[in-house]
């Protein structure tokens, strides 16, 4: 193999893309990963890091450009870590995400008879985020800055806009930056673990336009809070809720457990088709409302509900998918380990007049067995776990329960694939549909259908 050393300048042809969106050039089968390089491009690159099994390169020149390359519209793209794929056409992004899923389920796990559908994309893949979490800091001139983190760092890029956030959010961000400066509000400095204002969080109802503004502070005492609220209301008189969240931990967790309502309601309302949901500052609620409706409609299609089925909604959160399915089912049982989420789910069931739902707080694998003793046997199980996937004990419980169908939504196809291999003992993976919940990024969500063999 050719010698490869740091600072070498080399040329080559990109033969693949990684799941992180990096181009792959190979020298005698040795892979070099190069951010922002695209398949079939002939490039010049510099080696910046060499490891035992791979190297990292920096793109210097593109000698032959891919037909899928586009100009990134964001002026912060080269520095910001929020997006990874703005230089790739949207059609090619959707194809790349499908290839990721094919690679995981067919090439690696050998689910050769399982259908992988095309990625479900957006008509307009911008301005889709209904929740923004914006760090606050100071620059070297001691000026207030707000924006998002530089790639692979906690250095804040001072920004005036973000093209994947709701446009209202950037208006709020810019106004808040001015207010914090004018009122001389103390700003949290992560390295020193000192200061007050840590993050600004903004949530909007996609269909209702209700808006919640949350100030995350390092402690409860905030002398200027009344003045800040007054200025916010002057600038945004239609705001639904203003809250203070207290996070005095020294971790990377954005929000703490305690919140105080400074103005308006404790929650905002949003809708998904015919269902209405109450959302608090802490609620898990899908970031992309337009794509969530497509994702849930595909889940209902997979569930094949006729109105006679008992559905078990595990990892149910605030009840979104369970309540979405309730009009099509005989009864929906939801289970979630977070008490506040179950309270929200129960309230959302009342709001939607869903009398055929039951929501219980607890570990799914334990509650399922309790229900089994009570004679409750689901026909369909909905699974929507966090990124780490399902606990193995939960998978084993499902295998003993033997529902006719399992519909598995995942925000991490790698752990979904791992769980699919465990379910394969009794279940046939029929098909997987990727859904693009986060355009311009490498993230892909999937919904999969498993039928009992």
Language-model segments: what does each one mean?
Residues 202, 209-218, 276-280, 380:
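Short, aliphatic-rich beta-strand segments
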Residues 1-76, 366:
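Terminal RNA-binding accessory module
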Residues 60-72, 79-187, 207, 222:
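Extended interfacial segments that mediate partner engagement and assembly in macromolecular machines
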Residues 44-46, 133, 312:
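Hydrophobic beta-strand signal
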Residues 117-125, 190-191, 199, 203, ...:
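Short, solvent-exposed loop/turn elements at beta->coil junctions and helix N-caps
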Residues 40, 165, 288:
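Short, conserved phosphate/pyrophosphate- and ester-handling motifs at nucleotide-, phospho-/glycolipid
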Residues 2-11, 16-19, 224-453:
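Rossmann-like S-adenosyl-L-methionine
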Residues 23-28, 147-150, 214-216, 345:
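Short, acidic/hydrophobic/Gly-rich beta-strand patch recurrent on exposed beta strands
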